[in-house]
Amino acid sequence: MTRGFAATSTREIAERVGIRQASLYYHFAGKDEILAELLQRSVRPTVDKVAKIEALVPPQTRATALYLLALIDIRTLTEAPHNVGILYGQSDVTSSEVYAEFHHARQELVDAYGRFGLQSASPSVAADTDARELGEMLMHSIEVVTDIRNAGAAVTPQRADRIAAAALRMCDVPNEAVATAVSTAANLLEEFHYEDVSNGEV
């Protein structure tokens, strides 16, 4: 979809994913339904795990929750087919009728980032921003994964660790607390069957 979603035919989409066009229409009524599914795949797997993260991580250690959320989000964006996360910024996508549903799901994720971020942040950071602004900044820092993939580079476990740790440092989390979050999250990842998403190093 390098030419944009609007300029891409359903036949081209079918060829790209290796199925017949007729099979594509068996599952989707048209391009808008395909777009809706692609967008949801880039955000919904992470959103669906937010409640579990909050249940696993005590409120006093929210830096771990933020780090865990970032790692899971990185995995979602890394595993999204054909780097569909890159679609977010395309004008023909943002103007589509199905974008609103995706935007709602994405906002749930922004809210989670903002909530965990403020609970982790230093007093100075918390005083200078609100949850919505901080959530957007944190999420944008994670979405660099789509640019890395677009450039043809691999999102290695080491790179995932660095990106997730950078989110904590945006909140002015002390290095010692970052290290604790990294090691704790590495153990908690087994609860999500993501044992290989992180190597526990920064």
Residue ranges and their predicted role:
Residues V47-A51, I86-G89, T94-S122, T129-E143, ...:
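Amphipathic alpha-helical packing segments from all-alpha helical-bundle domains
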Residues V84-G89, E176-T180:
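Short, hydrophobic secondary-structure boundary micro-motifs
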Residues Q40-V47:
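Short, basic, alpha-helical segments at the C-terminal edge of helix-turn-helix-like DNA-binding modules
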Residues E37, A51-E79, N83, L138:
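Hydrophobic alpha-helical connector segments
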Residues D111-S122, A127, V144-V202:
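C-terminal peripheral helix-coil segments that are non-catalytic and often amphipathic
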Residues M1-E37:
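Helix-turn-helix
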